[in-house]
Amino acid sequence: MTTEPAQRYEIRFQPAARRAIAQRLPEAVAAAVLEFCDAALAVKPHQVGKPLFGPLAGCNGALRGTYRIVYRIDEKSRVVHVLDIDHRSEIYHRPRQ
């Protein structure tokens, strides 16, 4: 009996997430985030994160060390929109678009 591999989600980085990777995150954290997004997040976004509440309601979040990756899942088009990445103590204090 063979099982079909899970269909991957497309990962799209929004401007704030791209800026975080290029400018704010330490190099090792940025590399870990990119690897996580390309592997686990693209395959099982519901399992690797959790739903967020408050100002981030409707989004999911996953931790890489002390950094939170905030993302939204579009099931219809199988796209994960990575909205922002920052230290978990800072991510909740920035305004969202």
Q: Where on the chain are the PLM-derived regions?
A:
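Enriched for short, Lys/Arg-rich terminal
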Residues: 1-12, 31, 67, 72-97
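Residue-level recognition of oxygen-bearing side chains
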Residues: 16, 57, 90
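Surface-exposed, Lys/Arg-rich phosphate-binding patches that contact polyanionic backbones
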Residues: 16-28
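Active-site micro-motifs of SAM-dependent methyltransferase domains
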Residues: 19, 43, 87-90
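Short, well-structured alpha-helical segments
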Residues: 30, 34-38
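A short, surface-exposed loop/turn module that caps and links secondary-structure elements
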Residues: 38-63
